[in-house]
Amino acid sequence: MNAWEVNFDGLVGLTHHYAGLSFGNKASTRHRFQVSNPRLAAKQGLLKMKTLADAGFPQAVIPPHERPFIPVLRQLGFSGSDEQVLEKVVRQAPHWLSSVSSASPMWVANAATIAPSADTLDGKVHLTVANLNNKFHRSLEAPVTESLLKAIFNDEEKFSVHSALPQVALLGDEGAANHNRLGGHYGEPGMQLFVYGREEGNDTRPSRYPARQTREASEAVARLNQVNPQQVIFAQQNPDVIDQGVFHNDVIAVSNRQVLFCHQQAFARQSQLLANLRARVNGFMAIEVPATQVSVSDAVSTYLFNSQLLSRDDGSMMLVLPQECREHAGVWGYLNELLAADNPISELKVFDLRESMANGGGPACLRLRVVLTQEERRAVNPAVMMNDTLFNALNDWVDRYYRDRLTAADLADPQLLREGREALDVLSQLLNLGSVYPFQREGGGNG
């Protein structure tokens, strides 16, 4: 059956700032306390979406979350009106404010893990929300992510959205950022590659930085998504590269159809894994980048592998890269050799995503890939699909509500909270989402 990969990109939120919250993510740590530009960040993301949509790649949008997230501050013992809660946090424990104001939901590669209908036992598209247990600021995302996905994939005959796994370290799950799908045409059954960093009883694990994904979580997600057991491979990421800043597999590998583009040191027992994929995926092609040409350090600093590998109708592929790749002579030299070599990659497309990159999120972090048949595409909430009208409406919305300068101190401003809620109220109507945010359901307005 014919099917297409639709990229659902996260829209950057109004509180996008640099707080260095993500230990193990070198860019996040390095840019801590810098001044951010939320308006520019949102527009950089929107331009990527629109450019790819105009080039014929189906594209949709996932909205930001409510931030600062007052309900969690109340859980932590701060009481009073919303303004009083903010004021008490600033006075008593200001470190919490940045965590509950993070715009990290924009990196929707961590929103969920997807199983297309061609791979599932019941013939539905399955989406399992990620619990993001390893980082407090990200663990807050799951309930609203679930509400958003249910509002977008709202036809229960075709889509099953599963709640996140229990919030414990044993079941740490980071979503599609640790998941690849390999195969022929999108509509054919594919091989799902789940990548984990640690498992109980296995001493092979990183020592410097945390392994955020467990094998136990990956196995549970595969079960929830009803993936045919014959179409699953579990592989461990190389713990040495996690210790060098590769906190998700999509920082060291990316797949599309029959191609796996990865670093030579991406996986534990890599030659064994690639042999297994060759045996099980027709026409499988591994493009392994040697460490002698691109070091792990350079891969992390440029986000070479946090790229999007997109298929054209003629079978050729386009590699979508951040500008940092073009600015690194060694990486750009390698990429031009790649273009000239015998493989499906025939074009490089570069985007300026500096605002997201400075927090450790490249092109692949910003998108959730969902393979859909024509019938399934028609069943998706049409208001989220990118086109000229939506692009212009979202650009105007960003101009109206987003600040062009934000520091950590600004997060305490009650006006920022009010601006954010008003903006999300308008956006949820624009995207026909219903009341997906807690502040809408509580009926508390902006007070």
Swiss-Prot record:
Record key words, sorted: Arginine metabolism, Hydrolase
SUPFAM superfamilies from the UniProt entry: Pentein
EC id: 3.5.3.23
InterPro entries for this protein: AstB_sf, SuccinylArg_d-Hdrlase_AstB
Entry's Gene Ontology BP terms: arginine catabolic process to glutamate; arginine catabolic process to succinate
Pathway stated in the Swiss-Prot or TrEMBL entry: Amino-acid degradation; L-arginine degradation via AST pathway; L-glutamate and succinate from L-arginine: step 2/5
Reactions that this protein is recorded to catalyse: N(2)-succinyl-L-arginine + 2 H2O + 2 H(+) = N(2)-succinyl-L-ornithine + 2 NH4(+) + CO2
Top-level class of the enzyme under EC nomenclature: hydrolase
Record: active site: E174, H248, C365 (nucleophile)
Chain residues that bind substrate: 19-28, 110, 137-138, 212, 250, 359
Superkingdom of source: Bacteria
An example Gene Ontology molecular-function term: N-succinylarginine dihydrolase activity
Coiled-coil intervals, chain numbering: none
Family the UniProt entry places it in: Belongs to the succinylarginine dihydrolase family.
Biological function: Catalyzes the hydrolysis of N(2)-succinylarginine into N(2)-succinylornithine, ammonia and CO(2).
Self-association and partners: Homodimer.
PANTHER family assigned: N-SUCCINYLARGININE DIHYDROLASE
Name of the protein: N-succinylarginine dihydrolase
